[in-house]
UniProtKB/Swiss-Prot annotation:
Gene (name only): dsbD
Family: Belongs to the thioredoxin family. DsbD subfamily.
Physiological role: Required to facilitate the formation of correct disulfide bonds in some periplasmic proteins and for the assembly of the periplasmic c-type cytochromes. Acts by transferring electrons from cytoplasmic thioredoxin to the periplasm. This transfer involves a cascade of disulfide bond formation and reduction steps.
CDD domains: DsbDgamma
Xref: PROSITE patterns: THIOREDOXIN_1, THIOREDOXIN_2
Membrane topology: Multi-pass membrane protein
Disulphide bonds in the chain: 123-128, 200-322, 500-503
GO CC entries: plasma membrane
Protein known as: Thiol:disulfide interchange protein DsbD
Length: 583
């Protein structure tokens, strides 16, 4: 039983790691500018219009880039809501908006054909969008003057080959998100089954089964199934209501839950919860609360559907030391999602998973129950490691991107090391499992080994130029001339802008790498400065269907773009080198 559960936990951990982009080189999928920052303008009165941005999760707008310029009108000073302070490695302390921004505009004077020119620009981790300029009339009608036209041209593009790394169509992206959400939701069901095999719950299942059935003669199998199912549904109702309440409360605070202080606090809280799973201390309801709930439960009579249902509801409130930490973590996850459907369904599946063993024991008796022992404590400890994945995921959202693989690597090494220590050395199968775990440990240590290797070669790398020597091009016509003149060599075109954080990361961490520079020496390396978002820049973006920056294009020896090799978003040096080697 322990081995099966360990394999389940390893699967969960690998899924979390893959979702967080642990060691993979897959290109991330980015939304279009119109999807990431859905803009609308709504007239509120003859003298006021309301600008609204619905900002996708994980994306943000820079406050300093939001500018409103009146045409044939005068407006009162802009009244921004409180912004989030954000530390950027390259731009220092900046103010940003996440999730939603509403900006009321009040006119103090206006003439005929009055309008507003609204300028804004935003980013997400590893990717930035060109500045947007929208013209808004007083009746709320709007016309996009700049970069959003690129997204529209993308949809109408007649390019001969699809872009492998371009974002998917909106309906495809939605379908993929729904599929991913369904998968993540069902992990709560597996988590519930796992919680039933903790040392605080498993030994109580036979007693609980007897209480559910009651003191009368054992009912037939069908009635026993219905009674146990009623108990589980009562417990599930309590958990579902908890999920709905927490999700509803979480909705107004989604902006706060994105700020670094809150994310750091949540990471510390999850670490404390994980420590409780390691047995350092216990988290439970106050004794007085538990005694009152237990007294209420004892007043109910077993064997009756209504009483059994109420008993299940009360049991859902009595959080044991083994289940309170994972339950708290699940509730915090639900609060951050702010989704009522997700919140209710996730906690329902958690309770349903916890109730499956109870139903089986009620039907088939204690003979199917695994024997208690030290393995129960190991299951609890394994849950502690799963809990530690949450702080890593939270901190990866605010730390520089090169720290994320190091954190996942450290967690994986500690987890695998613990698995090696608890698996006995006797037996051929167990020895084979240990060998596989040792190999897994070696793979998990790769980011740290790569870090040490790069530091060890830093003195030698210093002899190489710190900055890659790009040849600048200004327009599409000039680029085509360069491609014609570069016959016989591959060409790399880097689209760069001063406002692009990930472009600066490429410049600092990737293009300064010795191995990358040696590989690029085999090519012609060109660069376009997109900082001013000029008409020439816009022409390039439309021609190549570029969504945002950084974007790096590659051309073969004949000057034809290698569309399958386009890079969107930041890649570290080793990832980018692997990408170059596949050209």
């Amino acid at each position: 039983m322990l081995k099966r559960f360990i394999f389940l936990l390893v699967g969960i951990t690998l899924t979390l790691s893959a979702h967080a982009g642990l060691f993979g080189n897959d290109q991330p999928k980015y939304l279009s500018g119109a999807e990431a920052f859905a803009f609308s303008a709504t007239p509120k009165s003859d003298k006021q219009i309301e600008l609204n941005w619905q900002i996708a999760d994980g994306y943000y707008l820079y406050k300093k880039e939001i500018q409103v310029t009146p045409q044939n009108a005068e407006i009162q000073p802009l009244a921004f809501p409180a912004a989030e302070n954000y530390h950027d490695e390259f731009f220092g302390e900046v103010e940003i908006f996440r999730n939603q921004l509403t900006l009321p505009i009040t006119f103090s004077a206006e003439q005929a054909n009055a309008s507003l020119s609204v300028h804004y620009q935003g980013c997400t981790k590893g990717f930035c969008y060109p500045p947007e300029t929208v013209t808004v009339s007083l009746d709320g009608q709007q016309a996009v003057d700049s970069a959003q036209n690129v997204a529209k041209n993308r949809e109408n593009s007649t390019a001969s080959q699809p872009l492998a790394n371009a974002p998917k169509a909106e309906q495809d992206q939605l379908a993929e998100n729904l599929a991913n959400n369904r998968l993540s939701i069902f992990w709560f069901f597996l988590l519930g089954i796992g919680l039933a095999f903790t040392p605080c719950v498993l030994p109580m299942l036979p007693l609980l089964s007897a209480i559910v059935i009651g003191n009368k003669q054992r009912p037939n199998t069908f009635k026993a199934l219905l009674l146990s199912f009623a108990y589980v549904q009562g417990m599930a109702l309590t958990y579902t209501l908890l999920g709905l309440v927490v999700a509803a409360i979480g909705l107004p605070f989604q902006v706060a839950l994105q700020s670094p202080p809150v994310l750091i606090s949540l990471a510390i809280l999850f670490t404390i919860l994980a420590a409780s799973m390691f047995g350092l201390f216990e988290i439970r309801l106050p004794n007085s609360w538990q005694q009152k709930l237990n007294a209420m439960s004892q007043k109910q009579q077993g064997g009756a559907f209504g009483s059994v249902f109420v008993m299940g509801m009360i049991a859902g409130l009595v959080a044991s030391p083994c289940t309170s930490a994972p339950l708290s973590g699940a509730l915090l996850y639900v609060a951050q999602s702010g989704d009522l459907l997700t919140g209710g369904l996730a906690l329902y599946l958690l309770a349903l998973g916890m109730g499956i063993p109870l139903i089986l024991i009620t039907l088939f008796g204690n003979r199917i129950l695994p024997k208690s022992g030290d393995w129960l404590l190991k299951v609890k400890t394994a849950f502690g490691f799963v809990m530690l994945a949450l702080p890593v995921f939270l901190l990866s959202r605010i730390l520089p991107s090169h720290y994320e693989p190091l954190m996942w690597s450290a967690l994986a090494m500690v987890f695998v090391g613990w698995l090696i220590s608890v698996i006995p050395t006797q037996g051929v199968i167990k020895q084979a499992v240990r060998i596989v775990l040792f190999l897994t440990f070696a793979v998990a240590s790769y980011p740290w080994a790569n870090l040490v290797w790069n530091q060890g070669n830093s003195s030698h790398s210093a002899q190489v130029s710190n900055h890659l020597a790009f040849e600048r091009v200004q327009s599409l016509a000039e680029l085509q001339e360069k491609l014609t003149a570069s016959q016989g060599k591959k060409v790399m075109l880097d689209l760069y802008a001063d406002w692009c954080v990930a472009c600066k990361e490429f410049e600092k961490y990737t293009f300064t790498d010795q191995a990358v520079q040696q590989k690029l020496a085999e090519m012609v390396v060109l660069q376009v400065d997109m900082t001013n978002n000029s008409a020439q820049n816009d022409e390039l973006m439309k021609h190549f269907n570029v969504l945002g920056l950084p974007t790096i294009l590659f051309f073969d020896e004949s000057g034809k773009e290698l569309t399958q090799s386009r890079v969107t978003g930041f890649l570290e040096a080793n990832q980018f080198l692997n990408w170059l080697n596949q050209l």
